[in-house]
Each structure stands twice: as C-alpha cells, then as structure tokens.
Amino acid sequence: MPEFVSPFSGLAHERKLTPEELIRAIRFMIAAEYEAIQLYMQLADSTDNQLAIDVLKDIADEERVHAGEFLRLLRELDPEEETFYAEGAEEVEEEIKKSKKA
C-alpha cells in the first residue's frame, strides 16, 4: 500500500532515479491516483450537497485521466508491462466466455 506521507517515500534525494526506480515510482503514482479516486467518490457518496458531489466527481474523473497518463508512461518505460496486462485481459476474456455458456 502506498505511503502518502512523502511523495518521495523510499526514494533517494541525493541522486537521480535509476530506470528501475522510476518505474517503481510511476507504479506508486498510479496507486496514488486510484486511491484519490476512491477517496473523492466516497466523499461524494457521503454528502447530499450537490455542488460538492459534482466537484468531487469531476476531480475523480481528472484522477482517472492522470492514472491513464501514468499507465501510458509506464508502458513506454517498461514495454514488458503490457504483456502482463494482455495476459490478465485474456484470462478475463476466458472467464467471460465460460459465464456466457453457463
């Protein structure tokens, strides 16, 4: 689980990131975006104030865009990442086919 105390949690400050560290940091940022989406949507679901609901949902949508940007960057930095996503998608496709036959 990401630790949000510091944006550089676990990272060295006195040098540039290695490619592997950058990839890990991008994964951390993706997790942070998804956590932010969850928090904004929970708050929106917890109020009757329509203005707050609208603003929170809009911000959550912006976080989804950020997650997409980070995911695209991750795929560029680590092309092998896409093979894992494709494998996972194929596994779900197989389950979908099974459930439609049942």
Predicted regions and their residues:
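Iron-associated oxidoreductase/ferritin-like identity signal
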Residues: 1-102
